[in-house]
Regions:
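Alpha-helix-loop-beta-strand connector modules within alpha/beta enzyme cores
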Residues: 9-28, 48-71, 100-128, 161-170
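Glycine/Thr-rich beta-alpha phosphate-binding loop at enzyme active sites
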Residues: 39-41, 46, 69-114, 153, ...
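A generic short-segment signal for beta-strand/edge and adjacent turn/coil regions
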Residues: 12-15, 36-37, 89-91
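Loop/helix-junction capping segments adjacent to catalytic residues or to phosphate/diphosphate-binding pockets
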Residues: 6-7, 128, 151-152
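Short, small-residue-biased leader/transition segments that mark boundaries at the very start
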Residues: 1-2
């Protein structure tokens, strides 16, 4: 079990925020709206079992970014109705970063994208070898972990994946 003290988390968050600001990248913290507000993060991402988007918005204020995990059209619509700025939908593929997940199939992903007016980001097992299978779904981006951090050269992997994502989204 990994445990980090609140002060360690706060210090690390401030360091990450500084790097993100330097490169013009929004900094969102997963499942910790209070910490996000405390360190001046740009936003928070919450899961279905975490606080509601409305609660996160109350903590972050009107300008904070609130992302919500969704797996069904119903969850997506509810998140949008409660003020989510974007949805993270998935896992869309089998992934090593989340155990015991059943992937959201392409048709459901497409239905979610059609059902909401906020950006949808596909997450979970997304990488260079399967990215193209998400084309035409309506997503507006992807979130990745292993596609970058499992690579020997993270910077090169990020550049390559970004190029591939941009090409896929252009259609």
């Amino acid at each position: 079990m990994l445990f980090r003290s609140r002060e360690t988390l706060r210090r690390e968050a401030l360091e990450i925020r500084a790097v993100c600001r330097r490169y013009g990248v929004p900094f969102l913290i997963n499942d910790a709206a209070e910490l996000a507000a405390e360190v001046g993060a740009d936003g928070v991402h919450v899961g279905q079992q975490d606080m509601s988007p409305r609660q996160a918005r109350a903590i972050l204020g009107p300008d904070g970014i609130v992302g919500v995990s969704a797996h069904t059209v119903e969850e997506a619509r509810a998140a949008q109705a409660e003020g989510a700025d974007y949805l993270g939908v998935g896992a869309v593929f089998v992934t090593g970063t989340k155990e015991n997940t059943t992937p959201v199939d392409y048709e459901t992903l497409k239905e979610i994208c059609a059902a909401v007016d906020i950006p949808v980001v596909a997450i979970g097992g997304v990488g260079r070898n399967n990215l193209s299978s998400l084309a035409g779904s309506g997503i507006q981006g992807v979130a990745v972990v292993s596609a970058l951090y499992a690579q020997p050269d993270v910077r090169a992997a990020a550049r390559s994946l970004r190029s591939q994502v941009e090409e896929m989204l252009r259609g």
